[in-house]
Amino acid sequence: MHHRGNLSETPADAGRYAGHSTGHARRVLVDKGIGSVHQELVVAELEPGGSVDSHLHAFEEACYVLEGALAFEGDGWTEELGADDYVFVDRGVVHALRNVSDAPARWVEVSAPVPGGALEDTVFTASHPLPEGVEHPYRKWHFDVAALPEPSGGIGLAGFGAANVGGAVAKIIVGADTGASQFNLMVVQYAPGGFITRHDHAFEEGFFFLEGEIEAELGDETSTLRAGDYCWSSVGDMHALTNRSDGVVRWLETQVPQPPSRYQARFTADWERFVAQPGS
């Protein structure tokens, strides 16, 4: 199962923040409605002077600012977030958002487990004790694309060998090493000619493209996706990516749940070679 779309063609509303926000719009890229059982992926916006009331969630959340400026309020602190800043918010932590600038602010938001179950997973409250065991209610960082290493094969992820990946670089910016337990959020970049061959996973992946264009093979469909496009691949859905352009392509990618310690990907070519060995 897979899904793809374009941000400008995706409907916007306040979603679960209706009545608890002003100047807030959310474009849902991935959620239960398209078949996901693990994650919600959203591009959200706050108009100048807009705000989202204090609340807490029964899921983990990460926000990556695309443009504009956000005031993030969490655990009694206020953080100013600008383009390419990102924040991880632990489950059960009260937080709020404001746009105190004179321009709209936009960000990518990933939440897991997938919101909208039988549990009341978003609660609006001005304050609440931290959950037991939470030492860092939220964490903030800045991503600098210039700090990415040179593209290569393998990309540093378990099971992604050089025969199946080339001209690529990936950096996990939110994951187990930064306090998240439910998902990985990555920045991925392919040089011209960069590729990953046909494969699947035991986890879902979501993609939001920031720069350039890529040929995406999703199941039996092949499409060219560009900045502002997005796609999603379910557990067991075969997919491949190739940069056939003359420029770099870069995107934000989610992996939900976090991948296993081994066999993070099953590559078609690897398996076909294995079963073709003499004696099989």
Which residues does each predicted region cover?
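A short, N-terminal "cap"/entry segment at the start of jelly-roll beta-barrel domains
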Residues: 1-38, 118-182, 266-280
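Conserved short histidine dyad/triad with adjacent acidic residue
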Residues: 23-27, 42-57, 186-201
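A structural feature that tracks compact, well-ordered secondary-structure segments
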Residues: 42-44, 110, 185-188, 197, ...
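Glycine- and acidic-residue-biased ligand/ion/polar-headgroup-sensing regions
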Residues: 59-70, 75, 203-215, 219
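A short hydrophobic beta-strand segment most commonly corresponding to one strand
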Residues: 62, 88, 102-121, 232, ...
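Short acidic-glycine-tyrosine-enriched beta hairpin
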Residues: 76-91, 220-236
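Asparagine-centered strand-capping/turn motif at beta-strand->loop junctions
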Residues: 98-101, 242-244
